[in-house]
Regions:
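Bacterial Sec-dependent N-terminal signal peptides
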Residues: 1-28
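Residue-level detector of intrinsically disordered/flexible regions characterized by low predicted structural confidence
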Residues: 6-11, 177, 198-199
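N-terminal capping segments
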Residues: 26-123
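Low-complexity, Gly/Ser/Thr/Pro-rich intrinsically disordered linker/tail segments
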Residues: 180, 185-190, 194-232
Length: 232
């Protein structure tokens, strides 16, 4: 009976967190730094829940945390950055101020939400290096394949957040409700920079000969986030 009560308390806490988690995109836009503080506070909430949960509740916490991360990055974090200009040497940490290169855009987003990654090292490396670290068991490579084949792969693999490395570029992919969008700091349109666009539009994703795609937020990746596990 005591065990059941403990389990129900954990589940109730998860449900409460879930309700709070998905309110961000509907709330008035906050200062970016303040919003990131809320994200880190939420991460700490998940860690406290996870540490005190039994085995069955731990799985539920991972599921909820994954949904929170995907929703927060896709619907809250990205919009802060839309319109931040691109530059090959751009390293800004603040949306709408300065410029940002494609690699720095990807690694800055991940570090900002609380992943312990070597932001500068990864931003300056080939994207395949960190894609293999973030999604070691969820990677697919395409060489000189038609865009329709890649769209089919993404739709079959399912909704979620992906990172993609190209010939000379890197960015995120959002798959949701059969819609596929490429989010990146766009060197084709440097004055616009960070933007979201259909993968089948005129962009580096469509034009690239090589593509390596990793699906983010596996159980392992979510646990690394919750437990502050560092990547090298």
């Amino acid at each position: 009976m005591v065990h059941n009560k403990k389990f129900m308390r954990a589940i109730l806490s998860i449900i409460i967190l879930l309700g709070i988690s998905f309110c961000y995109s509907r709330s008035e836009k906050k200062d970016y730094a303040l919003f990131l503080q809320e994200v880190i506070a939420k991460k700490n909430d998940y860690k406290r829940l996870y540490v005190n949960a039994d085995v069955s509740a731990k799985d539920s916490i991972i599921t909820v945390a994954r949904a929170y991360l995907i929703n927060t990055i896709s619907n809250d974090i990205f919009p802060y950055w839309y319109g931040t200009k691109w530059d090959f040497n751009g390293t800004t940490r603040t949306p709408q101020q300065g410029k940002i290169a494609c690699g720095y855009f990807v690694t800055t987003i991940l570090e900002d939400v609380g992943f312990k990654i070597p932001r500068v090292k990864w931003a300056q490396s080939a994207s395949e290096v960190f894609i293999k670290k973030l999604a070691p068991n969820n990677i697919k490579r395409f060489s000189n394949r038609p865009i329709a084949e890649i769209e089919n792969y993404l739709l079959t693999t399912g909704d979620g957040l992906y990172v993609v490395g190209l010939d000379i570029h890197v960015g995120f992919i959002i798959v949701k409700n059969k819609s596929i969008n490429f989010v990146h700091s766009n060197y084709y349109k440097p004055e616009i920079g960070v933007m979201k666009e259909d993968i089948n539009s005129k962009n580096p994703f469509k034009d690239s000969n090589y593509r390596i795609i990793g699906k983010l937020m596996s159980d392992e990746m979510v646990l690394n986030w919750i437990n502050n596990i560092a990547y090298d």
